[in-house]
């Protein structure tokens, strides 16, 4: 089984994904962390040197590579859905879970994080809202499952994801 988590920065993809993988004896990969490990530099440095387009190319290559694996939980970068080719890969491979979190919670979780290049603007809160408006329909387009959350603890969100995946399996087995 391949589980792919999508959602905005700060939605909890890494936290939820790591815990889900641990509970189900699966391998966990965070795309941003994997890109950093392979390049030897942080994401903001890649943005600085190669621009967002360069980073997105690396992200697309990694997504295509990793989504051929099974026994994997993959936390994607928030912007992975911007590329139609990535959306096609997501739609064709694995179970895609959209962690949908209110923008207020996203803001609270990310406002002090300097490792988020897209938020290094004069009004980061407005930027989060703008990115959400742009990306939410794309996350919904690729998602097999939508889990609304953000206010509870990460364990609660992991349980929601587990239950949603169980229900998804039941539905797909019935057809």
From Swiss-Prot:
ATP binds at residues 10-15, 116. Substrate binds at residues 32, 56, 78, 135. InterPro entries: P-loop_NTPase, Shikimate/glucono_kinase, Shikimate_kinase/TSH1, Shikimate_kinase_CS. Binds 1 Mg(2+) ion per subunit. The keyword Transcription does not apply. One of its GO terms (molecular function) is shikimate kinase activity. It catalyses: shikimate + ATP = 3-phosphoshikimate + ADP + H(+). It holds the Pfam family SKI. PROSITE patterns: SHIKIMATE_KINASE. It is an enzyme of class 2 (transferase). Keywords: Amino-acid biosynthesis, Aromatic amino acid biosynthesis, ATP-binding, Cytoplasm, Kinase, Magnesium, Metal-binding, Nucleotide-binding, Transferase. Its EC number is 2.7.1.71. Mg(2+) binds at residue 14. Catalyzes the specific phosphorylation of the 3-hydroxyl group of shikimic acid using ATP as a cosubstrate. This is Shikimate kinase.
């Amino acid at each position: 089984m391949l589980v792919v988590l999508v959602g905005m920065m700060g939605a909890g993809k890494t936290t939820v994904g790591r815990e889900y993988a641990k509970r189900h004896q699966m391998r966990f990969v965070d795309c941003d962390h994997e890109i950093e490990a392979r390049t030897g530099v942080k994401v903001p440095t890649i943005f600085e040197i190669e621009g967002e387009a360069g980073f997105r190319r690396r992200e697309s290559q990694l997504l295509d590579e990793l989504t051929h694996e099974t026994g994997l939980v993959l936390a994607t970068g928030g912007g992975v859905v911007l590329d139609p080719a990535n959306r096609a890969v997501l739609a064709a491979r694995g179970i895609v879970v959209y962690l949908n979190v209110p923008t207020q919670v996203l803001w609270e979780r990310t406002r002090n994080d300097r490792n988020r290049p897209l938020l290094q603007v004069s009004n980061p809160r407005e930027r989060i809202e703008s990115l959400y408006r742009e990306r939410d329909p794309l996350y919904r387009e690729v998602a097999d499952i939508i889990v609304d959350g953000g206010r509870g603890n990460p364990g609660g969100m992991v349980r929601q994801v587990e239950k949603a995946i169980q229900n998804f399996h039941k539905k797909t087995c019935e057809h």
